[in-house]
Amino acid sequence: MSRPITIVTGQWGDIPLEKLAPMMSGFGYDGLELGGGHFDITRGAKDRKYCDRIRALLDKHHLKVWAISGHVVGQQVCDPNDSRSDAFAPPELAGKPQEKRVWAVATMKDAARAARNLGVEIVTGFVGSSIWHLLYSWPPVPEQTIEEGFQYFARMWNPIFDVFDECGVKFALEVHPTEIAFDAITTKRAMEAVGNRKAFGINFDPSHLVWQMLDPAQFIREFPDRIYHVHLKDVAVRLTGRNSILGSHLPFGAAERAWDFRSPGHGDVDFEEIIRALNHIHYQGPLSVEWEDSGMEREFGAKEAIEFVRKLNFSPSSIAFDENF
């Protein structure tokens, strides 16, 4: 089992793909998870020649692509769409929540078409949530209100998943706070809300689970047939008795934050247990480094990360160790 090691390009959006591809190839990555400004979803849905040019550029540098990212677009499908998401939509839609939503739905349908044209079977991303702000049950939140949130997710996303089915592409939700699914319980409920359809699965990222005090390896084993894609990102939890796990309204990188993302191997994620769990479910897709660390130089981190992941990327045993005495 030789899983490819890729890197998410969204955090490198300031570097053109023509420069980023040879850089990441030089670091030793096998491919790119295209996001940010490195792949135009709408253009890719309509222009096969554009997709061919992207492929040719990657081929030139011995890179492949197994997934494209639709995170910032997908978020706007179910999000309240306040001013925070204005930067993620066309400028003329700023301050127009419903118009952003309509655009996001159309663009996520295009994401499936663009993936097909690029020869990719997975779109990773977010779905948003109309009920995330109701996480803390005060004032009291009726169960019916929560159920309506899951049904709203189903109404908004089932037509999108219909297009994914038509294109032979799957959507992998990054289970994450601010999404309809942020732990195992809400993931199961979200899947049930859309009829457990195969178009909807998981982009597994342990960093978002660990700071919520979840067990990432257990999560993998609970959804063995729905782990469609994997992000490798670390997180460090540093509760001091003064700060809250909720973040204290402090930005990433602030010294007093209770938790922060780290380059793989520099936080609290038990990556060996994750690899063992992935081996257990026979996952053979990419291990995609999503590099985020406010305390480390970016290129140093990306180079170190692939070496760390390469050492972890072991196959399961093909024999029982106690059969050969």
Pin down the residues of each PLM region.
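Short amphipathic alpha-helices and their capping/turn segments at secondary-structure boundaries
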Residues: 18-25, 45-66, 107-121, 215-228, ...
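Boundary/entry segment of secreted carbohydrate-active catalytic domains
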Residues: 1-15
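Glycine-rich, proline-tolerant flexible connector loops at the mouths of alpha/beta enzymes
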Residues: 35-55, 127-134
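Active-site beta-loop-alpha junctions enriched in small/polar residues
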Residues: 8-12, 35-37, 70-73, 128-130, ...
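C-terminal helical cap(s) of enzyme catalytic domains, especially alpha/beta-barrels
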Residues: 298-318
